[in-house]
Amino acid sequence: YMKKYIKNIVPATFMMLALGATSCIGDLDVDPIDPNIDTNVDLNGLFNKCYANMALAGNGGANGDCDIDGLDGGTTGFIRQLFNSNELTTDEAICGWGDEGVASFCYNTYNASHPMLNGFYARLTTGITYCNQYLAMAGDTDATMSAEIRFVRALHYFLLMDGWGNIPFTLEPMTKPEQRSRAQMYEWLEQELIGIEPALSEAKAKKSTDAGYGRVDKAACWLLLSRLYLNSEIYTGTAQWQKAKEYADKVIKSSYRLNTVGKGGWTAYQMLFMGDNGETDAAYEALLPLLQDGLTTTSWGTSLFLIAGCFDGEMHANPNDLTATNGVSAQNWGGNRARPDLIRKFFPQNDAPELPSYDMYVAAKDDRALFDGVGRTLNNEDVSTFKSGYAIAKFTNFKTDGSAGHDATFADTDYFLLRVAEAYLTFAEADARLNGGNTTSEGTQAVNSIRSRAHASTRTNAYSLDDICDEWSREFYFEGRRRMDLIRFNRYGGNNNYTWQWKGGSYEGRSFDAHLNIFAIPTNELTANSNLTQNPGY
């Protein structure tokens, strides 16, 4: 029943009003439902709401009530702000829009009053509130469902901890959150994920036609644990490479698998980001797909944001229809595009051609080079101009069988928030870090698996950590994780010799202070909760 979140959310609307969850300050201290009063709460609706917080702005569709005040609904989208905070701040993405907060992301000058960071913080804390509410009301009803909601809550807490470091923490809907350090949150997350694993469903790859598609199972738990362990040295000061490798290996050996066979003139990699990705074998790569449907599950801030926000009307990304742009009608917002540093990961000689995406990846000899260079410059000399920089044609609403989307405006493309490829690169990186900075034969094989899926060259000798840092970018650009990876490789804030165009607000790129590796606690949060203190440097 998950493919259409809305069917089950709408009956819960009255309940969300009781929750008072519009959370203008986004804190975790939201008024709970009193079960003695609200005896008709739709628990399935609340269960779905916990998942849907990552895919929808609020109750109803794209233009319905938003759960976060102070920004328009599309801007508060979970994926939109995951992208903005973790991609616009890095060597991958830049945006020329004038919305308040975009430039300070791009130039690494964000602070405690940043509207989009504060919106993402509110989105995460509101999602935690929904999970706490469900567990308080239905925690003993169904062990598997409760374990899933505990996972969703842990994922929200992970993102909050990764972004803001020292964060408000509570498991009760009615208590004022205490502040916990990153190291404390790490310890809680590790124990929580290990604790819920037995109650989660067995790891089983699924398509949208299978029961449970859109819900997490043991494999998602293993992948989040492997991510936690991979970043342990940043979070706690102590590395956990062996555990990262072990949990990544569990995912690799599960029934989830890399999509390796293309269809209908599309590559296997492209299929992961298309309008029928839940219906094709691409779905078997997704450990947590966020469901989208152009008719029933609509959002301005999820897949459509990554499709429309990266296209202008002159781009054509369909090799089978040279008049089509991106598979949605008249949704070409032309904002987010590549920094030259991303393109150079595929064209190290600065010789990226001016071609459409379906010819670009052939020239790159790598299916992941889904860039449009027609009439564009490689450099971002004029940040406000969309053609100043190569465009990204990675996300579309096209379908492998050539059929039309369910709706002209909104996308059917599910967003694969967790996918198997992460396990391969986690395994390889942990392997290299355990082996003096170069992969052993099994780590080499893990990188080769990722590269051969993309028809890129492979090797028999080792991959270095530098190679792996670049491979994270090639495989996952624009998927909302680059900031985390750069920090782990000491290439983000602080004095390091890794620069990119416009890093720190300088065209040539310059270092910025290490305190920016952690975002600022929103000012209004500090006012609302006396338990919180601001992060250092802000």
Write out the residue ranges for each language-model feature:
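Conserved, well-structured interaction surfaces
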Residues: 44, 48, 52, 57-58, ...
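Flexible, polar/acidic helix-loop-strand segments at domain edges
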Residues: 97-119, 337-419
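Long, intrinsically disordered, low-complexity segments
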Residues: 23-27, 40-43, 94-95, 124-125, ...
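Short coil/turn linking the two alpha-helices of tandem helical-hairpin repeats
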Residues: 161-168, 231-237, 435-437
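Membrane-proximal, proline-rich intrinsically disordered regions
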Residues: 24-78, 530-538
